[in-house]
Amino acid sequence: MLLPFQVTKNITLLGSELFNLYLVKGETYAIVEGAVSGITYPFLEQLDQLNVPPEAISHLVILHSHFDHMMVFPTLKGRYPWMKIVSSDLNRAIFTSERTLAKIFDSDRKITLALKERGIISEAPNLHPPTFFPLDITVQEGSVLDLGKGMKMEYLEIPGHSPDCLGAFLESEGVLFCSDGAGFYTPPDFFRPNYWYRLDEAEKSIDKMKAIDPDILCRGHYGAMIGKDLARKHLQMNRQSIEDFKAYVLEKINEGYSVEEITQDVTLRFSKGFLELFPPEQNYRLWKLLIQRTLEHFGIEMEER
């Protein structure tokens, strides 16, 4: 899929295959999803290619506060302060925590370095952790961002992957932006769960998105799933991946495997696609957390060996 890619008349997919941003056109423009800082310069070139001036962009939408969904925005906000950052009300605490922001910016720096080492990008902004990250507009379940010309973006809370994870539904386009709320996907057909926060909330969130039944599902990685059948397939496959993982963890526990042994197996099998850019120790930590969340769901306590 060559980028920029026209998803609908009013929505354009930008960024890269691995890290997506969406340009949404109303009377003004919004950018949904913020990718990593390494995508900043290619993204700005794409805007120029589309003849979209910065003055036309009014809102920058962060659907959850993980570094790989927000780090193009520091440069944009610094250059163009009229752009308003939109995110969950839960992020007031995160965006004012120097310690948390330092971790976010450090993770972004590591991924940017990996992108350079692999020749995916040649340069990137040199960002330094701020004392706070701006949050101009907070949203919650049922909030609406009206961009004009019928482009009303309604927000839904879809926790599970993270407590602050949001979806955004544009009914006029039949488009649901799900960020990472619908699990991880790597083309062509590899689905796996990502409930770092809570398993039961992840299940409810996917069921909520299935009830919306969008025509198009826009992910934060690997682009837009166009067509109701494909959107349904993606939501169902990610829902099934949760069930499969629950069964897998229970089976391994019953066979006497330790959390560390299960984590080693999962890390090897699940760290595919854009996750290959992550440091190995970070992937290990994330998949161990997924296993721990699964055990918590079942009320199983295990001592580490």
Sequence positions of predicted segments:
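Metallo-beta-lactamase
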Residues: 36-38, 152-236
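C-terminal regulatory/interaction regions
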Residues: 249-305
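C-terminal functional module detector
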Residues: 233-251
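Conserved beta-strand hairpin/beta-sheet module of binuclear metal-dependent hydrolase folds
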Residues: 1-50, 167-180
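Divalent metal-coordination and catalytic microenvironments
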Residues: 10, 24, 33, 64, ...
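A short catalytic or substrate-binding loop motif that flags glycine-/basic-rich loops and adjacent residues
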Residues: 14-16, 137-139, 159-162
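Active-site HxH/HxHxD metal-binding segment of metal-dependent hydrolases
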Residues: 49-143
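Residue-level marker for buried hydrophobic side chains located in beta-strands
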Residues: 30, 61, 85, 175-177, ...
